[in-house]
């Protein structure tokens, strides 16, 4: 479905307030490995194939309009230029930033994008903010002006809402859990301890604060919202748009679809470590904007304060036991990265059919060095299938993938990857 995206009036030239600047970092694009790009490509092929029929109608046009493609991790500077046509900018940030800062960025029409990339082990979902979620999840629907109006309004409210020490402790617990889960070498005991700490912080929440109300409304809409018909809704929430596995659950009886209601939303807590048991279906984005104004009146918080880029709301200091530079490093062997890069180079073309088959044969011999790596086998198999070479080796790789389907989650990942090999629908976002 082709939509005509509406461009914003005038360029985005307002300066970023000084108190938000420390959260902005340079995207370390050269640090992304061929494995990182392969993870991006796997997830995006799945996303586009599924959301073609299940996401908000602007999704595919929104991907293109926001400067996002399938084959490689996007450059945030490219996204920034693309989004400026729709009244937005994009900046790179270092993982979790304080909730008030996260909200104020968006209230000012600035999409903060974490630069981290999820690992192969967490390809289906990661609790840590990463570039898949924050670019391919958040950016596409921002090309809809009515959604933009809603996001800026709720985030302006969130930037001014009062938080409690319990809210701040919960933020730190969520951040710690995401770091532990994405850090190679974390022990089950460390993960368990972080999960227990999160549960303790959740249990310590007494009365629902202003910030918690807005956070819940944001979660059930911007992150996990559905729109349209209750029996056949469309997805617009970033958490769903960046996770096909959870999106597929939406259309089963495992997830209750509930008509959107402001009071129900702000009184319904959420758990970032589990699938959502229910989701809210709004009639339109205008309905959501109206709800934000109702909540703002109820909390006696004026809207419109952040339109002047020189005004600001104080941001609480970031308190953490880890430094901003102490981010997880994925310990991929150099030879494995080189093998992924060789496959990436072949996909780019520029070699003869004879040379391509010779390289695929050489890479096939290397697969045995990585007996547990299912993604590189899918990458190899896709190329061999596309160019109709080495049929016996293809059969052996398929058998190896079958043997690697040792858990329900792994089985689903491999099956989803195999389903797209030799098919065209996910090849582009057009």
In which residue ranges do the predicted regions lie?
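The feature captures two recurrent sequence modes
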Residues: 1-191, 314-409
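Short, hydrophobic/amphipathic alpha-helical patches that form generic packing surfaces
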Residues: 80-85, 152, 156, 212-226, ...
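Mixed-charge, Lys/Arg-rich low-complexity intrinsically disordered regions
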Residues: 294-322
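Basic, alpha-helical terminal appendages of large translation-related enzymes
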Residues: 403-430
């Amino acid at each position: 479905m082709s939509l005509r995206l509406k461009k914003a009036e005038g360029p985005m030239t307002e300066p970023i307030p000084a108190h938000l600047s420390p959260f902005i970092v340079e995207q370390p694009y050269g640090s992304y490995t061929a494995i990182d790009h392969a993870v991006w490509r796997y997830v995006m092929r799945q996303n586009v194939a599924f959301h073609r029929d299940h996401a908000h109608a602007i999704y595919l046009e929104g991907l293109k309009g926001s400067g996002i493609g399938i084959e490689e991790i996007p450059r945030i500077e490219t996204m920034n230029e693309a989004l400026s046509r729709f009244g937005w900018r994009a900046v790179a940030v270092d993982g979790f930033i304080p909730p008030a800062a996260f909200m104020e960025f968006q209230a000012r029409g600035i999409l903060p994008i974490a630069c981290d990339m999820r690992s192969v082990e967490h390809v289906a979902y990661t609790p840590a903010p990463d570039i898949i979620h924050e670019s391919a999840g958040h950016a596409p629907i921002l090309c809809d002006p009515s959604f933009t109006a809603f996001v800026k309004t709720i985030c302006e409210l969130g930037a001014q809402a009062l938080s409690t020490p319990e809210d701040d402790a919960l933020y730190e617990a969520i951040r710690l859990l995401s770091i532990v889960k994405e850090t190679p070498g974390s022990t089950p005991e460390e993960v368990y301890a972080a999960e227990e700490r999160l549960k303790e912080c959740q249990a310590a929440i007494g009365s629902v604060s202003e910030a918690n109300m807005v956070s819940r409304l944001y979660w059930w809409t911007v992150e996990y919202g559905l729109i349209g018909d209750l029996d056949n809704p469309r997805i617009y929430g970033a958490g769903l748009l960046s996770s096909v596995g959870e999106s597929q659950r939406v259309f089963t009886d495992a997830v209750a679809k509930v008509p959107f209601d402001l009071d129900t939303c702000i009184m319904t807590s959420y758990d970032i470590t589990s699938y959502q048991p229910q989701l809210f279906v709004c009639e339109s984005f205008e309905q959501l904007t109206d709800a934000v104004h109702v909540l703002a009146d109820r909390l006696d918080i004026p809207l419109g304060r952040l339109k002047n880029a020189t005004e600001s709301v104080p941001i609480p200091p970031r308190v953490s036991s880890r430094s901003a530079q102490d981010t997880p490093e994925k310990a991929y062997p150099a030879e494995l990265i080189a093998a992924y890069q060789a496959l990436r180079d072949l996909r780019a073309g520029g070699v003869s059919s004879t040379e391509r088959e010779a390289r695929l044969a050489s890479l096939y011999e290397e697969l045995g060095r990585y007996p547990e790596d299912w993604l590189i086998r899918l990458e190899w198999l896709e190329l061999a299938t596309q160019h109709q070479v080495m049929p016996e080796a293809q059969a052996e790789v398929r058998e190896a993938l079958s043997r690697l389907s040792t858990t329900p989650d792994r089985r689903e990942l491999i099956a989803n990857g195999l389903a797209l090999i030799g098919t065209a629908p996910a090849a582009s976002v057009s």
